[in-house]
Amino acid sequence: MKAVIFAYHDMGCQGVQAVLDAGYEIAAIFTHADNPAENTFFGSVSRQAAELGIPVYAPDNVNHPIWVDRIAELAPDIIFSFYYRNLLSEEILHLAPAGAFNLHGSLLPAYRGRAPLNWVLVNGESETGVTLHRMVKRADAGEIVASQRVAIAQDDVALTLHHKLCQAARQLLNSILPTMKCGDIPSVPQRESDSTYYGRRRPEDGLIDWHKPVSTVHNLVRAVAAPWPGAFSYNGSQKFTIWSSRMCPDAQGALPGSVISVSPLRVACADGALEIITGQAGDDITVQGSQLAQTLGLVAGARLNRPPATSGKRRIRVLILGVNGFIGNHLTERLLNEENYEVYGMDIGSNAISRFLLHPRFHFVEGDISIHSEWIEYHVKKCDVVLPLVAIATPIEYTRNPLRVFELDFEENLRIIRYCVKYRKRVVFPSTSEVYGMCTDASFDEDKSNLIVGPVNKPRWIYSVSKQLLDRVIWAYGEKEGLRFTLFRPFNWMGPRLDSLNAARIGSSRAITQLILNLVEGTPIKLIDGGQQKRCFTDIRDGIEALFRIIVNDGDRCDGKIINIGNPDNEASIQELATLLLDSFDKHPLRCHFPPFAGFQVVESRSYYGKGYQDVAHRKPSIDNARRCLGWEPSIAMRDTVEETLDFFLRSVDIAERAS
C-alpha cells in the first residue's frame, strides 16, 4: 500500500518509522522548514526522510493547486498526518482511496485543537493519550480508528509527558497500521457532546497570576517547563522564569504574590504557597530557588507583580465609527480593559458609552459619518486599526428605507475603506451573516458557500447586497493594492444594550428586543410567518472576544481572512427563542411589575415588514476559520444570554412610572 505522509516534530519521526516498519511504501513526505525563532529540541523529519532516501518537501502552502496536482500524481492509497501543523484541504483528503488519517495528541473528542500536551497539564488532568482518526474538513472531528491512554503522573512536566506520548504513539501505530494495511480500518464516530476545543498557546500565556489557587500556578509551571518558554513573573521590572516548583498548603495568611520566605523560596497564592525549586532571572543561568531570590534581591514580604507598563511603547490606536452601537460599546469596554489600547470613536449619540466618557484612553466625538468626513480622514490616518461599524441593520428598514440603507451601508463606508487604502491602515470590517442569503448549505462556509439572494423586486436584500458588494471591494483592494483587512460576519449576536425598547416601539429593532417590549407592555408576541425561521444566537461576550482576537491578530493570521463569528450549538427558531424568553420572564424577580402575558400572535411577514420582504429558513455558521485563526470557541449557552439580556432591559424600565 502506497502512502503519502505529512509529518513534523518527534511524533512525525515516530510515525514515519512506524509506517515503514508496517510494510507501507512511502511515496513522499511533506514537512515544515524549521523556524529559526523556535527552540527545535525535537527530531527532524526532513533529515530522517533524506537518510531513508524518501523524497521530502516543505512547501509554504501544500494546499496550493500545484501541490495538490503533484500529490495526485503520486497516486497514494492512503494519507497519514503526524503532527503536521497545517490543515489539509478536502482536495488532498479525497486523493487517497483508503482515506486520510491524523495522529492527535489527546483522547478525542477531548482537547481538539492546538497544544493538547500543554493544555492537559494546565488543567491538571490525570490522563491523556493519543488518537488516530480519519481526517475530515473539520479539524480533529473525524471517526476514531484507535486510541491509547497515557497516565499523567503528578511529577510529569511537558517534556516527560511528551516522551510518554511519543512512546504511546509508536505502540498504537505498531498495533493498528498492519491491520489498516489489510483494509480493515475500524471506525467509531466521535461524541460531539463530549468534545472540547483549545487554541494555540503563546509564550505570554505563561504569565503567572498569583491570585489563582496554588494548584493552578503549579500546573502552569509543569505545562510550559523547558524546552517550552516557561511560566514567569516579575519583581519590579525584572522578569524571571520558574522552571520547577512544588505546592505547599499554607500561605501563612500572606497576600497573593507575597514572598513568604527566600530559603526555600516560597510565594503566596490564593489558597497556599508555591515553592520555587529552580528558576532563571532574565537570560541568566538556571539556579535553585534560594539563589534566584538572591539574584532578584527578594526578601520576605516582597510583592511580585504583573509586567510593568512600558511607557516607551505606543499604545495601539483603534478607531471605532459607530462606537455607541451594540458591538461598538461592548468592544470599547473589552479594549479599555487592556492597557495597550486607546480608543477613538464617533457616533450620533453617547447613551451606551457614557460609562467610558471620562476614561483617559477613550476619545469620543459626537457626529455623523456622512458629515464629518475631515475628522474621519484625520483619525484614519492617525489610528492603527479602523472598524467602520455604522450601518442600518434592522430588517424592517430594508423595505422601509432601501435607498438610505444603500447610501449609509455602502456609499459612506466605501469612502472610509478608501481612506484606509490611501493611508495603508488595517481595516476590520463588519460583514454580515445576511450575505449568505438563501444559501442551501447545512452550514455556511466563508470561503466556499454561495451567496444567494432574491429578485430585484424584493428590497429586503438591499442590506445583504450592499454588504456583499463592499466585501468584494475590500477583497479587491487587498488583492490589488495591499489593503490589510479582515471581514467578520456576526451571526445573531445578543446581549445587553442590543437596540433599545424605544427603537422596538417603532419596529426598528432586532428580534429579542421586540419580544421583550411585547412582554413589558403586555402586547402579544408576534411570530412572523409562525416563527419557524431558525437562527444561531451568539452571546455578545463570545462575539466580542472573537472580535478582540481579530484586532490582536496574533501572527497576522487574520489578514485577508473572512471569519464567521457565531454559535452553531445555539440554533433555535424564533418561536423557541420567544418561549425561552417567556419562561425567563415568568421567573424574573421583577415579573410582578409587568402586565400579564398576552399570548402569541402569528402574522404574515408582508403585513409586518411591508411589500418586498423575504425570509430565510436557516442560518448556521461554519466556525472552522475562527477556530483556526483565533483559537476561539463559543461557550455561553443561549439560556444564559436570554436571561442576561432580559434582566438588562427589565431593569432599564422605570417601574415607578409604570405603577403611576
From Swiss-Prot:
UniProt binding sites for (6R)-10-formyltetrahydrofolate: R114, V136, K137, R138, A139, D140
Region (Formyltransferase ArnAFT): 1-304
UniProt-annotated stretches for the region Dehydrogenase ArnADH: 314-660
Active-site residues, Swiss-Prot/TrEMBL: H104 (proton donor), E434 (proton acceptor), R619 (proton donor)
EC code: 2.1.2.13, 1.1.1.305
Entry function: Bifunctional enzyme that catalyzes the oxidative decarboxylation of UDP-glucuronic acid (UDP-GlcUA) to UDP-4-keto-arabinose (UDP-Ara4O) and the addition of a formyl group to UDP-4-amino-4-deoxy-L-arabinose (UDP-L-Ara4N) to form UDP-L-4-formamido-arabinose (UDP-L-Ara4FN). The modified arabinose is attached to lipid A and is required for resistance to polymyxin and cationic antimicrobial peptides.
Protein name, entry field: Bifunctional polymyxin resistance protein ArnA
Organism: Salmonella typhimurium (strain LT2 / SGSC1412 / ATCC 700720)
Gene (name only): arnA
